[in-house]
Amino acid sequence: ASCKCDDDGPDVRSATFTGTVDFWNCNEGWEKCTAVYTPVASCCRKKK
């Protein structure tokens, strides 16, 4: 599932969701792109 990274923009309707929901921690080579901590899932994005 896709999720909204912090820098995708504040407007949920017009924002592009560039993150991917990952359960627990992000995969290797990916980084968490939200400041909000949720224990079950992280919003991750491939490292540039």
UniProtKB/Swiss-Prot annotation:
Alphabetic keyword roster: Disulfide bond, Ion channel impairing toxin, Nematocyst, Neurotoxin, Secreted, Toxin, Voltage-gated sodium channel impairing toxin
GO annotations of cellular component type: extracellular region; nematocyst
Highest taxon in the source lineage: Eukaryota
GO MF annotations, alphabetized: sodium channel regulator activity; toxin activity
Biological-process GO terms, alphabetical: regulation of signal transduction
Gene3D superfamilies, A to Z: Anthopleurin-A
Disulfide bonds: 3-43, 5-33, 26-44
SUPFAM superfamilies given in the database record: Defensin-like (SSF57392)
Main localization (coarse): secreted
Extra facts: A synonymy between H.magnifica and R.crispa is controversial.
Family statement: Belongs to the sea anemone sodium channel inhibitory toxin family. Type II subfamily.
Protein name, as recorded: Delta-stichotoxin-Hmg4a
